[in-house]
Amino acid sequence: MTTAQVKEIEFFVSEKAGAVTGLLMKPNEARVLLILAHGAGAGMRQRFMENVAAKLSNHKVATLRYQFPYMQKRTKRPDPQRVLTDTVRAAVAKAKKEAGNLLLFAGGKSMGGRMTSRADAAEPLDGVAGLAFLGFPLHPSGQPGVTRAE
């Protein structure tokens, strides 16, 4: 098992959204940092997100898990897409400052992955070498379609 330092961080998203928190888990000898957004129903401290970060840490992959503003404020309804993609960009900017010489990847679980891909499709995420998704719904359950894939 690899030893990792865990640090709580805060970063500013926008005047409207305010600041959010994140958890940087950085194992010794890390070479990569994955910026990891949570899904719609559970935040960065949800068991799945913690397990993913811990297992990646064992393979010398650092993670930056972060909250979207609605989860930070403990409201149930996700923020508008613009706020979510602005949060992705703010998380990437913060990760660049924290990463040192680590190679950056970005992604997330479900909605977090989708918002990361939308942010990158609109304008490539600065300094990000690739994207990684942990569950990526292209349509709501029971409603097949491809509009989210376009």
Tell where the protein language model's regions lie, with residue ranges:
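Short, hydrophobic/aromatic-rich segments at coil-to-beta transitions
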Residues: 2-10
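Serine-hydrolase catalytic machinery in alpha/beta-hydrolase-like enzymes
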Residues: 10-103, 118
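Primarily recognizes the serine-hydrolase "nucleophile elbow" in alpha/beta-hydrolase
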Residues: 88-150
